Amino acid sequence: MSTVTWGKKRKRSGGDSKAKSRGSSSYIPRSVSSRRESLQVATFSWTSSGSGIKFSPGGAAYLVSNFPQGANDNCRHTNKTVLYKFMAKNTIYLDSSHYMKVFRAPFHFWLVYDKSPGANVPSTGDIFEGPSLFPHNPWTWTVSRAACHRFVVKKTWSCVVESNGIDPTKGQGATYYGPGPCNQVKSCNKFFKRLGVSTEWKNSATGDVGDIKEGALYIVGAPSQKSDVYVNGYFRVYFKSVGNQ
């Protein structure tokens, strides 16, 4: 019976071991990752008292990129800001004059970028083609051809409020068999990222639209169905100060 003989282990030469040691000890330098600077935060409410603001047919626009000059977190530190994120936590409710009606009223929002803002916040008629002809149908509005090089709609969303003919502030008797509750009050929350709205500022201390050299952001709201609607709550923006001081 023949025996199986296994091959002998090959002895490594000194050159092989040195080459392996050189390969194992090779160092690949890595770049040092710098920590990204935190975004600044500014929070706004619709009114200083916390009450709701009334929107009537035709709608209205309000400045979002409102950053006065200063050292606080909600202020601009340089002559340029970039707005990245937007959060809205709002409550929408009908004016009490519409409680006796039976209808549904969609409410529309837009985030609109203005490349060349003026001394005042523009009206919806300055931005859109439609408010004069269709003031009660804001879903038909679009940026006018004459202003398309100035205004850009970044985001849009809507929320529906309703009325069932019953005043919700009054109690009903034991024999009431009318309609049930409806969305006379509706919450409407939104969060948008990657907006990238760049704003260049004049050498001034305040943060109004007249202080902006280029690039403003507005929130625009408009009710439908000949209704008057209140919007209550707040919105928050996340931005960064860039450029020179």
From Swiss-Prot:
Query: What are the subcellular locations of this protein?
Result: Virion; Host nucleus
Region Disordered, as annotated, extends over 1-31
Give the motif span (Bipartite nuclear localization signal). Answer: 5-31
A GO MF term: DNA binding
GO cellular component, alphabetical, reads: host cell; host cell nucleus; T=1 icosahedral viral capsid
Family that this chain belongs to: Belongs to the geminiviridae capsid protein family.
Share what the entry says about its subunit structure, partners included: Homomultimer. Interacts with the movement protein. Binds to single-stranded and double-stranded viral DNA.
Q: What does this protein do?
A: Encapsidates the viral genome into characteristic twinned ('geminate') particles. Binds the genomic viral ssDNA and shuttles it into and out of the cell nucleus. Plays a role in protection of the genome from degradation, virus acquisition and transmission by insect vectors, infectivity, and systemic movement. The CP of monopartite geminiviruses is absolutely essential for virus movement.
Q: What is this protein called?
A: Capsid protein
